[in-house]
């Protein structure tokens, strides 16, 4: 298994640090030849429009779309989850490049601005009974799940904050900003 972390923008360093802590040496993916070397890819939080545009500039949108969910497991956190969604609400004017690989509808910045960021416990039975610490920074919200896409994580109010579709995983929160590595370990099993 070879794990890559998309390193164009956002908090890729934090994901790399967690992977190293659990014994995995990641490849920082910035170019198509690096993407071709990995079978697991983390798309980090950051700014989804910027990451999408950089994926287009560096000609990685189509290779990721082609391989995503087949021979490439993908996990998108926050902005990465937006990029994975096949429907994005509240896009910037003019739209934004996305991968559209997961059958889910997501709303950008659903909880408000940077000042409205928060932490809350997450129920995620797929990784264990103990609640997961959730860090939400300008977080999107999963509004609807389509065929083949299942909810795997919830806030106390029932809001879906994690979804899985085969080898694709989307989280609207930032596990890489906590000391809990269970979601990273789950991703490695996809």
Curated annotation (Swiss-Prot):
Keywords: Glutamine amidotransferase, Hydrolase, Lyase, Pyridoxal phosphate. GO terms for biological process: glutamine catabolic process; pyridoxal phosphate biosynthetic process; pyridoxine metabolic process. SUPFAM superfamilies: Class I glutamine amidotransferase-like (SSF52317). InterPro entries: Class_I_gatase-like, PdxT/SNO. Gene3D superfamilies: 3.40.50.880. L-glutamine binds at residues 46-48, 108, 137-138. Pathway: Cofactor biosynthesis; pyridoxal 5'-phosphate biosynthesis. GO terms for molecular function: glutaminase activity; pyridoxal 5'-phosphate synthase (glutamine hydrolysing) activity. GO terms for cellular component: cytosol; glutaminase complex. It catalyses: aldehydo-D-ribose 5-phosphate + D-glyceraldehyde 3-phosphate + L-glutamine = pyridoxal 5'-phosphate + L-glutamate + phosphate + 3 H2O + H(+); L-glutamine + H2O = L-glutamate + NH4(+). The active site is at 78 (nucleophile), 174 (charge relay system), 176 (charge relay system). Its EC number is 4.3.3.6, 3.5.1.2. In the presence of PdxS, forms a dodecamer of heterodimers. Only shows activity in the heterodimer. Catalyzes the hydrolysis of glutamine to glutamate and ammonia as part of the biosynthesis of pyridoxal 5'-phosphate. The resulting ammonia molecule is channeled to the active site of PdxS. Belongs to the glutaminase PdxT/SNO family. HAMAP family: PdxT. PANTHER family: PYRIDOXAL 5'-PHOSPHATE SYNTHASE SUBUNIT SNO, PYRIDOXAL 5'-PHOSPHATE SYNTHASE SUBUNIT SNO1-RELATED. This is Pyridoxal 5'-phosphate synthase subunit PdxT. It comes from Chloroflexus aggregans (strain MD-66 / DSM 9485). The gene is pdxT.
